Amino acid sequence: MKKVHERFLEYVKVDTKSDETTRVTPSTKGQLELGKILAEELKKIGVDEVRISDKGYVYACLKSNCDKDIPKIGFISHMDTAPDMSGKNVNPKIVENYDGKDIELGNGYTLSPSFSPELPMYKGQTLITTDGTTLLGADDKAGVAEIITAIEYLINHPEIKHGDIKIGFTPDEEIGEGADHFDVEGFGADFAYTLDGGRIGELEYENFNAASAKVEIIGKNVHPGSAKGKMINSILVAHEFVSMLPLNEVPEKTEGYEGFSFLLDIQGEVEKTSLSFIIRDFDKEGFKNRKERFNEIANELNKKYGEGTVTVTLKDQYMNMKEMIEPRMHIVETAEKAMKQCGIEPIKKPIRGGTDGARLSFMGLPTPNIFTGGENFHGRYEYISVNSMEKAVEVILNIIKIYAEK
């Protein structure tokens, strides 16, 4: 039987960075390649029903091995890695018996406790890091490896009784499209868990309400020598737009349950400037107010510079799954119990982001989120503890056992 970290090291070799510009699903060929690898592996270890959809989703089911009426539990992870940094030619480094000090990644980069204050808690453990040139892909190939390892353990230990266990691997989660083509009905689970969290112990059933905002500003270009009273510099209007948003409600100045507006990208010249934002808030009313503020600013600037100068396009992305999970809190409570059974103190906190589970919960599949063990996702300083990965496998198995014993 393969160890969880061995699987993980194989999966990160496949470049699965998603790309929101391609407008196809999956957005990149590497995700389909990994999906085929995973499907073949699931068949090889003895999983009963395995299929890949035309959109690259991998679905599988380990059939029940007892007559008892047990809930059908799903475990879901995503195959893509974030577009923020390259996932090509990932060259993981294994740090055995970590000494609690700086880790030289290579290529001039150092992972240090001054940057990652949590590092010393992993002293004595085996860590997997990057070489400084790519992200690692623990988000979320660690989750994929943990699920398959748990499933193989069940197959090799038929004395462990369980109901139907549903497995799902999704593409394009990192660009907000992971649930777009998920076949909830065909998946057939009563509820599920995503393995897409970070630090060991994380258990999440609240997430941001999320929207994107595209702001387009049309200016007027006139020769600068005779521009007085005529020119409208769209770049400066864009600056004005940003300055009218709450200046302290940005990612780098917020935490916990605080929301924000995040300017992701700006492209511009005098005649036309485009701004791309994301809007996040845990509170439904606060979320509504943030979106309304974008339209209010556009109206104010259009009064100042002329109708049609500023156009705002808002698009909801996902909503806070809390309202869908709370009526079924046994799902969260079971995960808590499963963690405590293997010596982990659950860390319940809101997700300052989203997971496939957020949208799936509103599609009729309540899906809280469990840790994978990774840290510093989406960049060159990403790393994961092998011990945390092994504990995630234990938690999956404990959840399955608890429901089988009820």
UniProtKB/Swiss-Prot annotation:
Give the function comment from the record: Cleaves the N-terminal amino acid of tripeptides.
- Its source organism is Clostridium perfringens (strain SM101 / Type A)
Q: Reaction catalysed by this chain?
A: Release of the N-terminal residue from a tripeptide
Q: Which GO annotations describe the biological process of this protein? A: peptide catabolic process; proteolysis
The protein depicted here goes by the name Peptidase T
A single GO molecular function term of this UniProt record? metallopeptidase activity
Checking NCBIfam families in the record gives:
peptidase-T, PRK05469.1, PRK13381.1
Q: What is the lineage of its organism?
A: Bacteria, Bacillati, Bacillota, Clostridia, Eubacteriales
* EC code(s) of this entry: 3.4.11.4
Q: Which UniProt keywords apply?
A: Aminopeptidase, Cytoplasm, Hydrolase, Metal-binding, Metalloprotease, Protease, Zinc
Q: Which gene does this sequence derive from? A: pepT
